[in-house]
Amino acid sequence: MSNVHVIDHPLVQHKLTLMRRKDASTNSFRRLLGELSTLMAYEVTRDMPLQDIQIETPLETMTGKVIDGKKLVLVSILRAGNGFLDGMLNVVPGARIGHIGLYRDPDTLQPVEYYFKMPSEMAERDIIVVDPMLATGNSAAAAVARLKQLQPRSIKFVCLLAAPEGVATLQKAHPDVPIYTAAIDRELNDHGYILPGLGDAGDRIFGTK
């Protein structure tokens, strides 16, 4: 799993444990997700390409470094992926935002797209796809396949928790897409929930059932 990166920073692991607790309030869960996504953004953007530019400081001219290429795009898999956006925008405030809506067909159990809205000129952009849970991996694989049609420069997938089944599915479909997660949990249950997990991330973010 050389293309899977578990972010084991102590603050990430501490906040993730607080989020897992069943007695964490909606407010606490949402706040912790924002803090976690900010911390994870530093790791995910670690290898972004740089270019040299000439600037003037108050004292002299120097060569500085800035991010190379077009603006980064954060793509949320609706609806839970939206919980990642504010925290990541703390680190990359100039990023563009895209959304993909998918639901699971009850007969085939395969993802079906119902919404797709992206910034213009996606070719050669770097994309970070965000979804708190990588469970079966089917939605993630479908989202990445759809985004590849736009010919971006790179795609990364970021989640809070991953199941081994989801990691295997996404890696098999897209071995070129690195996965960043705070933890890889034990397994999926019969209903497709990650164990031990943290429950339904969307419901816990938005206070719904």
Swiss-Prot record:
EC category name: transferase
Cofactor entry: Mg(2+)
Pfam families reported for this sequence: UPRTase
Annotated NCBIfam families: PRK00129.1 (NF001097), upp (TIGR01091)
Sequence positions that bind uracil: 194, 199-201
Family that this chain belongs to: Belongs to the UPRTase family.
Matching CDD domains: PRTases_typeI
Biological function: Catalyzes the conversion of uracil and 5-phospho-alpha-D-ribose 1-diphosphate (PRPP) to UMP and diphosphate.
UniProt lineage: Bacteria, Pseudomonadati, Pseudomonadota, Betaproteobacteria, Burkholderiales
Protein name from the UniProt record: Uracil phosphoribosyltransferase
Gene Ontology MF term list: GTP binding; magnesium ion binding; uracil phosphoribosyltransferase activity
Reported regulation of activity: Allosterically activated by GTP.
Alphabetized HAMAP family for the sequence: Upp_B
Organism, scientific name: Acidovorax sp. (strain JS42)
Protein's gene: upp
InterPro entries with a match to the protein in the record: PRibTrfase_dom (IPR000836), PRTase-like (IPR029057), Upp_B (IPR034332), UPRTase/APRTase (IPR050054), Ura_phspho_trans (IPR005765)
Enzyme Commission number, as recorded: 2.4.2.9
Cofactor remark: Binds 1 Mg(2+) ion per subunit. The magnesium is bound as Mg-PRPP.
Transmembrane region(s): none
Binding, 5-phospho-alpha-D-ribose 1-diphosphate: 79, 104, 131-139, 200
BP GO terms, sorted: UMP salvage; uracil salvage
Keywords per UniProt: Allosteric enzyme, Glycosyltransferase, GTP-binding, Magnesium, Nucleotide-binding, Transferase
Superkingdom in the source lineage: Bacteria
Pathway: Pyrimidine metabolism; UMP biosynthesis via salvage pathway; UMP from uracil: step 1/1
Coiled coil feature spans: none
Catalytic activity, as annotated: UMP + diphosphate = 5-phospho-alpha-D-ribose 1-diphosphate + uracil
